[in-house]
């Protein structure tokens, strides 16, 4: 599962999820991808479940890129504990996803296989997504 090797601070503020994604809004590495339509926290377990669903459907064919990383810690207090006495212990890691962000990319498989694999992956995620293709510019790909 994905998690940072080391962090400067063990606990972070929750923050706001306003606006659209600044970067990572286009398919760069693969041919097909899924793009977030809503803002949400996506946990490292959800990312891993989506990755497994895709690779199992593709039967180890093709290549998968994970474009998000869970770098934000979230905390939780134990059950039946009174309020106060500080912030809770770190519980897990999340990736902050805003609308427009490409989450996963796939290449090396047909469009039908990619569409189904990404559909299965999207069912593991807590947000609405859409299937996107690499944009062609003047008849050739935007790879340089």
UniProtKB/Swiss-Prot annotation:
Keywords: Ribonucleoprotein, Ribosomal protein, RNA-binding, rRNA-binding, tRNA-binding
GO cellular component entries: cytosolic large ribosomal subunit
Pfam family, one: Ribosomal_L16
Domain of life: Bacteria
Entry-linked InterPro entries: Ribosomal_uL16 (IPR047873), Ribosomal_uL16_bact-type (IPR000114), Ribosomal_uL16_CS (IPR020798), Ribosomal_uL16_dom (IPR016180), Ribosomal_uL16_sf (IPR036920)
GO biological process, one term: translation
Molecular function as annotated in GO: rRNA binding; structural constituent of ribosome; tRNA binding
Known role: Binds 23S rRNA and is also seen to make contacts with the A and possibly P site tRNAs.
Family label: Belongs to the universal ribosomal protein uL16 family.
Xref: HAMAP family: Ribosomal_uL16 (MF_01342)
Quaternary structure (record): Part of the 50S ribosomal subunit.
Name recorded for this polypeptide: Large ribosomal subunit protein uL16
Gene from which the chain derives: rplP
């Amino acid at each position: 599962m994905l998690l940072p090797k080391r962090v400067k601070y063990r606990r972070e503020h929750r923050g706001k999820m306003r606006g659209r994604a600044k970067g990572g809004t286009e398919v760069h590495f693969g041919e097909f991808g899924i793009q977030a339509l809503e803002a949400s926290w996506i946990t490292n377990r959800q990312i891993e479940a989506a990755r497994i669903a895709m690779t199992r459907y593709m039967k180890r064919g093709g290549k998968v890129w994970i474009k998000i990383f869970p770098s934000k810690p979230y905390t939780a207090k134990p059950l039946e504990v009174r309020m106060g006495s500080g912030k809770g212990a770190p519980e897990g890691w999340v990736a902050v996803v805003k609308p427009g962000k490409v989450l996963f990319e796939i290449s090396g498989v047909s469009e039908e296989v990619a569409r189904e694999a990404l559909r299965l992956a999207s069912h593991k995620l807590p947000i609405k997504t859409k299937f996107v293709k690499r944009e062609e510019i003047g008849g050739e790909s935007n790879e340089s």
